[in-house]
């Protein structure tokens, strides 16, 4: 019987492999030994001004050269794309890019979108992500392996372990730490399993955070945090590497805050806060001196609290983006729209969001490293890829120039990951991870949404085909 089954198993494996190859091929727009992208505008991700009428040569998965089209020569057999009217940007480096999505319920539940999110991230130009917290860590690790092997389409993934949460979690998808020893155990277990970063959460104690940071740093790994029980300055002194959500998550300005407890009234304290005060300036100085990066995640706050507007913060074109709504399941779409309907039209939330934006600008002005992500949680209106574009647009709304915002969303993330020699900007020798958009984001940042081709390791994927392949799936799988 075993002898008869072996040929059948081999046949089925071969059919499966062929199907996966065929599935990948249908989404490829361009693949060749040598590719020439001619007449293209280049925003290289370094913050430099755009360069017009450039030719980018791609070979072996890498950028071979960049130069003026008028003076660049290349072999006649190169696959040439004339990109007049288009802009090449580095692939985005998403630094708060979960693979899970809110499913509603009480208590709140979350499920991995292992089918839809990898394709959407890739389709919309996010070629590298850090998952920044996992509710299904084995799934995330396996997805990374499948993507790296070419069996699944998606971005390059840096896997963050399950949340390091203290007692009092608001959702059952998180393990609650027992003590500092439990934190050490979790860090070492998940580092052994393949996680490359860790995320402390809202109710962690100082002892637990210190233990996690010590164990992670012994292994050359970093710790970020969405904190509440611990203020930013305390966390920086403990040795945390990164803080998520900027000003929104800093509880240290609550007057009667108790150690190791997440206080009520954080938003109220921030509404009263003077960013020019000595306390805020000391926080910024401490973060910069301790080399603590901040992750900007403006879209999740906009979607959750900003009233609809014609443009700017709360723009209906962003919060009710039809292309985004189309990739949601009916249940997910209805749930989000119901949540949006509860947002007060007279909300003073916009002023708080403006203050958070000003804090991020002040942090950068002081020399801090600001990185970017979307955080696809909140009220269910933040979706892979679409939210990443909105984050860049909101950075411009915050007062950064378009090329500065693009740098924050690309090269800055690569620097934090220690990957700046490989990704994050368009330069000879780097991986050919690029997004090709119609228009000029340096003049009109919303053009970043007009993605047509995404190159990952030198292979150009059709953005629209990838998006169409996951219509109605977000909120299901």
Segments and roles (model prediction):
Residues 7-17:
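Bacterial N-terminal signal peptides
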Residues 21-33, 42, 48-89:
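Histidine-rich, glycine-flanked metal-binding segment
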Residues 40, 56, 61, 85, ...:
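Divalent metal-coordination and catalytic microenvironments
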Residues 40, 428-474:
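C-terminal cap of metal-dependent C-N hydrolases
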Residues 86-151, 170, 175, 181, ...:
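Metal-associated gating/positioning segment near the N- to mid-region
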Residues 117-138, 155-162, 191-204, 213, ...:
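Divalent metal-dependent hydrolysis catalytic cores, especially in the metallo-beta-lactamase
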Residues 144-148, 209-220, 288, 361-364:
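Surface-exposed amphipathic alpha-helices with a cationic face
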Residues 186-200, 204, 249-393, 397-398, ...:
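Active-site neighborhoods of metal-dependent hydrolases
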């Amino acid at each position: 019987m075993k002898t008869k089954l072996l040929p059948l198993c081999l046949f089925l494996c071969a059919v499966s492999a062929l199907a996966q190859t065929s599935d990948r091929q249908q989404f490829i727009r361009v693949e060749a030994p040598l590719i020439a992208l001619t007449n293209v505008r280049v925003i290289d991700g370094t913050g430099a001004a755009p360069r017009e009428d450039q030719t980018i040569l791609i070979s072996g998965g890498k950028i071979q050269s960049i130069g003026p089209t008028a003076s660049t020569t290349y072999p006649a057999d190169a696959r040439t794309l004339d990109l007049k009217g288009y802009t090449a940007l580095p692939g985005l480096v998403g630094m708060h890019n979960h693979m899970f999505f809110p499913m509603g319920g009480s208590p709140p539940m979350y499920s991995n979108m292992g089918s839809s999110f990898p394709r959407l991230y890739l389709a919309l130009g996010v070629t590298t992500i850090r998952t920044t917290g996992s509710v299904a860590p084995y799934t995330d690790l396996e997805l990374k392996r499948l993507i790296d092997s070419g069996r699944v389409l998606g971005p390059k993934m840096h896997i963050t372990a399950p949340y390091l949460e203290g007692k009092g979690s608001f959702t059952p998808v998180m393990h609650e730490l027992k003590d500092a020893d439990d934190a050490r155990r979790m860090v070492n277990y998940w580092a052994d399993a393949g996680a490359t970063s860790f995320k402390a959460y809202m109710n962690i104690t100082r002892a637990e955070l210190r233990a996690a940071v010590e164990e992670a740093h012994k292994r050359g790994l970093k710790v970020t945090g969405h904190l509440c029980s611990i203020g930013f300055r305390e966390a920086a002194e403990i040795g945390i590497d990164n803080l998520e959500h900027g000003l929104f998550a800093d509880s240290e300005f609550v007057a009667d805050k108790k150690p190791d407890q997440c206080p009520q009234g954080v938003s109220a304290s921030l509404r009263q806060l003077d960013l020019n005060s000595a306390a805020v300036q000391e926080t910024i100085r401490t973060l910069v001196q301790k080399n603590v990066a901040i992750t900007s995640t403006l879209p999740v706050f906009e979607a959750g609290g900003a009233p609809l507007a014609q443009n700017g913060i709360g723009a209906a074109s962003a919060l009710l983006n039809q292309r985004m709504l189309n990739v949601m399941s009916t249940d997910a779409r209805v749930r989000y729209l119901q949540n949006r309907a509860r947002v007060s039209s007279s909300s003073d939330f916009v002023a708080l969001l403006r203050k958070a934006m000003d804090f991020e600008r002040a942090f950068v002005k002081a020399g801090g490293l600001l990185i970017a992500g979307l955080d696809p949680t909140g009220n269910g209106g933040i979706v892979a890829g679409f939210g990443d574009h909105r984050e860049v647009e909101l950075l411009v709304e915050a007062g950064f120039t378009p090329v500065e915002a693009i740098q924050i969303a690309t090269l800055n993330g690569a620097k934090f990951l220690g990957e700046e020699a490989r990704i994050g900007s368009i330069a000879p020798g780097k991986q050919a991870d690029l997004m090709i958009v119609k228009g000029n984001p340096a003049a009109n940042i919303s053009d970043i949404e007009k993605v047509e081709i995404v190159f990952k390791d030198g292979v150009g994927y059709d953005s629209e085909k990838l998006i169409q392949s996951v219509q109605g799936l977000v909120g299901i799988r």
